[in-house]
């Protein structure tokens, strides 16, 4: 097995671990706490190739589904996927895929930022849909609760991911996987 093949198996697990660890960091701002889950998904997506990034986000969901306490605040279990926040989580693999496809070592910071914003937008679409259909909220309430409080924090997360990605990829450039 080649070194890159080994890495393509290890990196999704490492990415899922990063997402799980950062999901436990909760910033209690206002009525709705901010977590670093989307920051982690965006960072993993910006650094890894699309396949590994998508697998990392999917593995994270599988670990949570089987009951490991990897979701925000130590949550886990299959019931999470039937609650009002299910759409946010289920959008993570799509977030990872889109962001990873649009980001690479030579991507300018502003394009990395836009890639994060585009991928993160999919998370908000999923979240608003699940708040509406599973949480029985009206559309306006779902947007007010599930999007509005997160706009500025997520733009900041996207900016940080964009600023951090280039130096991280530069540091890893000597490894063939990251070329």
What are these regions (language model features)?
Residues 47-48, 98-106, 168-172:
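Structural signal for the C-terminal ends of transmembrane alpha-helices
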